[in-house]
């Protein structure tokens, strides 16, 4: 019984380590995607505001 518990614990530890590494990689990719999307949004927004300002001037 004790041996089974220790092996199960070892498997859980390796799995948690693997999932932690995987999740950190996912978080990094998500942050990069959010950052690039935010940059694209700000570029688009600045273009739209420039167009609207030019329209107001005319």
From Swiss-Prot:
It comes from the Bacteria. This is Uncharacterized protein YczK. It comes from Bacillus subtilis (strain 168).
């Amino acid at each position: 019984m004790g041996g089974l518990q220790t092996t199960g614990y070892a498997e859980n530890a390796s799995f948690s380590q693997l999932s932690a590494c995987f999740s950190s990689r996912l978080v990094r990719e998500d942050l990069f995607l959010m950052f690039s999307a935010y940059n694209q949004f700000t570029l688009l927004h600045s273009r739209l505001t420039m167009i609207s300002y030019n329209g107001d001037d005319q």
